[in-house]
Design a protein with these regions (language model features):
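Short, solvent-exposed loop/turn segments at the edges of secondary structure
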Residues: 95, 109-113, 134, 155, ...
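Short Gly/Pro-enriched turn/cap motifs at secondary-structure boundaries
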Residues: 104-109, 174-177, 182-183, 195
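Zinc-coordinating Cys/His ligand positions in small cysteine/histidine-rich zinc-finger domains
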Residues: 136, 140, 398
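Acidic/polar loop patches that form or flank catalytic/metal-binding clefts of enzymes
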Residues: 125-131, 148-158, 169-175, 243-246, ...
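C-terminal accessory region downstream of the catalytic core in glycan-modifying enzymes
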Residues: 144, 149, 160-171, 186-257, ...
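Active-site-proximal cap/lid insertion segments
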Residues: 1-134, 144-158, 196-201, 210-216, ...
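Extracellular/secretory pathway-exposed regions associated with glycan biology
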Residues: 246-327, 331-410
Length: 410
């Protein structure tokens, strides 16, 4: 009873497949002394449960269950909106967040940490549980992995197949959130949380969310290890996030710190790996086997193995000589992705027309890791990466500013 049906009429998306519209309540929840909104809420959750069961049974009936993966999750914790004029609702009515603090819109676990069920009879063992934090962007990489295609280089996610299948080694992913003045990051098994990040000097609260789900014990400042972790968290959030003009933050003007690496451990050069293949997007070359690798003095196409159906991955470190605004300019015949630290700096992939793309970052003096991905097109290959600083004219990045790890031989 109840349900929905497609009418194809504007404004008629709320209807009923059977019975009187806006009327059905699951009999398990009527006459129990709860509010009308609570009856609606419980009915909706139960309907979802039944529908998921229907989907799984249909998959089995079609005999495709051995070749199917189903993921069921949520985008946030319990909400406080009633969605009915004049009615009120509290996320605590059915204790939907369990022992967690917070709700939808909060960066506490009650707002962020949602249950996820993975079902795949031929791959995923039932009854297993993982407390490893992951984020929505990991699912695209995961589905690409299951489908046997290379994930796009532009995404932040990592495949969760090793965790789901209990095989291989799980790569570390990025779990980072910011909303209004809230900021959260998972690092080294701990969660850093700033509920009022009015400036970058504000310290993170630090929680062990596995043993302390309610986030009741702030570990920040309790010993030198957590003092060091505090410093790393403050540096890492600047290396991950990109300012957004539509959601300005008080820490947008902070300089991105370089890595704590001695230049003595580096040498001049660019690490280059070559790939052959036909891809619909710039793939994540770091998760693929390279045809060959070499060391070049600068970024060029000398190592390109073919003019068509080929790709290059340039990587290493850029030595930034002075703090301030640094603009990077990319132009290519083909497609490209440019990252510094874990930031997507330039996206020249989908619908890229070959014109110059520029992005400005606030970088501190020091050593910053980069990756430049290039995929050939049907035209003659070409690629250019330039930089520009307050006292550095626009031009190709000089060879003495491009570094790689250790002593390298060309």
């Amino acid at each position: 009873k109840g349900g929905l049906k497609w009418l194809g009429q504007a404004g008629k998306m709320i209807n009923t497949a059977e019975g009187t519209i806006d009327h059905y309540r699951d009999p398990n929840y009527t006459g129990k002394g709860i509010t009308d909104v609570a009856e609606r809420f419980a009915t909706s959750i139960t309907r979802i449960d039944h529908c998921v069961g229907d989907i799984l049974q249909t998959i089995k009936d079609l005999k495709i269950d051995k070749n199917t993966i189903v993921i069921f999750s949520s985008d946030n914790g319990p909400h406080r909106e009633a969605y009915i004029k004049g009615k009120r609702w509290s996320p605590s009515v059915f204790q939907s967040a369990g022992t967690f603090k917070g709700s939808k819109g909060s960066s506490y676990e009650g707002g962020l940490r949602v249950p996820t069920f993975a079902w795949g009879p031929s791959r995923i063992k039932s009854g297993k549980k993982s407390n490893s934090p992951s984020q929505f962007h990991d699912w695209m990489a995961t589905f690409c992995d299951y489908a046997g295609v290379n994930a796009p280089a532009r995404i932040d996610g990592v495949s969760l197949v090793p965790t789901l299948n209990r095989t291989g080694k799980q790569r570390k992913g990025i779990v980072y959130v910011e909303f209004n003045n809230q900021q959260g990051l998972y690092l080294d098994g701990y969660k850093g949380l700033r509920m009022k990040a009015t400036g970058h000097a504000v310290d993170f609260e630090i929680f062990n969310t596995i043993d302390d789900g309610p986030e009741s014990k702030n570990l920040a400042g309790t010993n030198e290890d957590f003092n060091r972790l505090q410093k790393r968290m403050k540096a890492e959030v600047l290396r991950i996030r990109m300012p957004n003009k539509h959601a300005k933050k008080s820490y947008d003007g902070e300089l991105v710190p370089g890595l704590d690496i001695s230049k003595k451990d580096l040498s001049n050069g660019v690490a280059v790996k070559t790939y052959l293949g036909e891809w619909d997007w710039v793939p994540e070359f770091t998760q693929m086997s390279a045809e060959a690798s070499s060391l070049e003095k600068n970024i060029n196409l000398k190592s390109l193995p073919a003019e068509k159906n080929a790709g290059l991955l340039f990587s290493g470190y850029i030595q930034i000589p002075e703090p301030g605004d640094w603009t990077f300019h990319c132009e290519a015949s083909g497609s490209l992705i440019f990252k510094i630290h874990n930031k997507l700096v330039i996206d020249g992939d989908y619908k890229y027309d070959g014109t110059e793309i520029s992005t400005t970052l606030k970088l501190d003096r020091g050593i910053h890791p980069y990756r430049l991905y290039y995929k050939t097109s049907a035209k003659k290959p070409s690629l250019s990466l330039q930089w520009e600083g307050s006292s550095v004219a626009k031009g190709l990045i000089p060879a003495d500013a491009l570094l790689v790890q250790g002593e390298q031989k060309r």
